[in-house]
Amino acid sequence: MAEDRIKSKLRRPASIESTMSSRTKPRHKPSPMSILMPHLMVGESFRKYRPHGLRNIRMNGHLDWNQLRKSFEKQSTFHGISHAATADGKWRWFWYTAFTICLLALLIQIFFLISKYRQYGKTVDLDLKFENAPFPSITICNLNPYKKSAIQSNPNTKAMMEAYSRRIGSGDKTEGIAAALSATGGLHAKVRRAKRKAKGKPRLRDRRYHQAFAQCLCDIEQLTGDRKGSCFAAFKGKIEIDTNNTAGFMNLHTSRCLCQLDTVSKALWPCFPYSSWKEKLCSECVDNTGHCPMRFYKGNELYENIKEQVDLCLCHKEYNHCVSTRDDGIILEISPNDELNDLDIGKKIASQLSAQQEKQAEVTTTEAPTVTQALGFEELTDDIAITSQAQENLMFAVGEMSEKAKESMSYELDELVLKCSFNQKDCQMDRDFTLHYDNTFGNCYTFNYNRTAEVASHRAGANYGLRVLLYANVSEYLPTTEAVGFRITVHDKHIVPFPDAFGYSAPTGFMSSFGVRMKQFIRLEPPYGHCRHGGEDAATFVYTGFQYSVEACHRSCAQKVIVEACGCADPMYPVAEMFGNNTKPCQAVNMDQRECLRNTTLWLGELYSKGKEAIIPDCYCHQPCQETNYEVTYSSARWPSGSAKVMECLPGDFLCLEKYRKNAAMVQIFYEELNYETMQESPAYTLTSVLADLGGLTGLWIGASVVSLLEIVTLIVFATQAYVRKRKGSISAQSHHSVPVHRASRVSLNTLHKSSTTQSVKLSVMDIRSIKSIHSNHSSKSKQSILIEDLPPAIQEQSDDEEETTESSRTNGSCRYLAPGEDLPCLCKYHPDGSIRIMKALCPVHGYMVRRNYDYSVSNSEEEDAEDEVHREPEPFYSAPYEHRKK
């Protein structure tokens, strides 16, 4: 390579100039000294030669940092440095100061740039796509999870319902101060009765007015559903109706009423629904009548005097007076078959007291305290709280059954769905619906469950979606079911439907419309986000056959923690096989298991509220990376209208239609628009943006680019190489003693004299690898230049260490020492057949022929030798026959 050649121009000696003249014969035979002198002069000149540039910065045995700096300044593309290279004095300092300040500003901005990138911000791209969206899956449930007839046929579930009935029957109906005093035990009937007997007051059974339960008919306003006036009590098959209020049409509904029984007139009036009566503390009750005016205790008297001055009474704001409560708390039960004229109040009260005592004895003997505590009714007084606890107890009792037994206690598909159409076509019930059992709502049925079939709505609007006629069958409703209607869940077909969390209620007697809009979410993975791929493959995921969702993850983790802490599973969640075949649901009457479950659930709730759920292994529930949600809009209208045919009911048959108004509902789910939204997260600041901003900043402050940075890298590499060479050279100089060059020159002269008679020149120097060219200018007798490349380096003594030093010296371009008695190689160029192509004038073997003007091809230019060297293989060093040129 041209950069690896060592070029040196030397002044030719007079003897060489005379011998190298073109086509002239020498007057005498050249002496050996004339042949050796160029080599000696090249060796001396080579020591003085040092190429310029960043690669050769070692001068006089040390690193010349000043030369390095100057070379870098002249070649640098940094704006400030390049100006400083040509400036002097204070302007040089000015440019360096400006460059330093700009460099500091650049570093500060690079720091903020990296900090911004490390925040991993993201943006949300909202895109509205106008194309047919896939229709969602619809899961339909009855608000009543199990049929009452099926619950009563099972001993465990029947016991749960009986416990609830006993607890809800003993609930407190008092209000205000009466409730507070009753809770503290201050109003015991026995104490009050004892005090009244001591004062000689008459017995309560001899008074005129009594409280009584009776069946009644109430007139209900059709438009508002409000009751109009008092109700009419029924006894012995007759109904007492006010004849003055029969002019208009009466919409009568049966109800259970609390009435005032007048033993003198033998009448039940007034009657109001029992729920509308309130218990108060009356201060001016008349003992012999049982009548109390609307004057109540205000709380000004001392607690010790309350028992003697007040009475418990039931009041109604529409009646404007109260009826005193019996000391034993018994309220008469009047059936429609009772004859008021022959009614024996004392006998009636005695029979009710005996029945109540038997019931209490049965509760005491059959229900252990631990069972009562396990059921959770012990500290509850509110009816809503008691009902909620009863629903949970029923769930625990059913959870102990097998899957088939659970499904048999709930509704079948044909019992729940009466009619169905989709996109104005009839549904195929067995093919379009599948059973999905939910622990809260029992048997639910999912429409569009097949994941391999694509179901789409081709038009927007209620008529082109799913329309179903659902039947509740109120006669099979449990006492714990607080509302009549259905639970509708709109969800993606790949995830678990959770009707208790994400469902919508549709009441009976209405047409419920659910307008749907689809939204797709595409989230980023770390480090930009925390979405999760394939969470359904986790060891704790209990909803087999469904994809990952956040709610499913939370419930799976809760089930895992409960099983590990309590040894049993929560019946609200599935019991997966991963927990083992021995894992059973917690029992409803096991106090320890129920208490452990409550405490564990509270602990989990605290963790989630504080954001510390990550302490539970595999329970940090991130959002899925791809998710499809549905936004639902609800609206309703009264149904049926009365003018349309519903099942077997003809238009205008209001008595038949009333059955469906109380038990059925029309539900329709449809797309509001044939488009959907996609919300896709994308990095707010990418690596490409960082590089672009970095390039802009470096160009703004110091005018640099990537190529400018490579200049610094090159500077570091060259400086490192020079430093390593210096270290190796200093170590070699300290370890070995070098042989002087002039000694080798004297040995070579003696050898040349001996070999002159045999027409071969032998020098006592080691192999010279290659002498590239010796150029002669035959047209000019002035200065001649000889280009010598790759001169052999001098070596030390023959040893393993010296060989390494010699190899290093060769690569560094120093002269190699030739040992005494060693022949100089032939420098001529040969043809492939072995004949001489170019004869060198300084060849130690054939050079004398050139100098004697033999007619052979001679190299006369540097260009020819250089071109020949580049394009041809090096010739072997051996003596071969040569061909005489024909004249």
Curated annotation (Swiss-Prot):
It holds the Pfam family ASC. The keyword Iron does not apply. Residues 1-93, 720-887 are cytoplasmic. It is a multi-pass membrane protein. InterPro entries: Deg-1, ENaC, ENaC_CS. One of its GO terms (biological process) is magnesium ion transport. One of its GO terms (molecular function) is monoatomic ion channel activity. The chain crosses the membrane at residues 94-114, 699-719. Residues 1-33, 794-815, 859-887 are annotated as: Disordered. Keywords: Developmental protein, Differentiation, Glycoprotein, Ion channel, Ion transport, Membrane, Myogenesis, Sodium, Sodium channel, Sodium transport, Transmembrane, Transmembrane helix, Transport. Glycans are attached at residues 244, 450, 473, 581, 599. This is Degenerin-like protein unc-105.
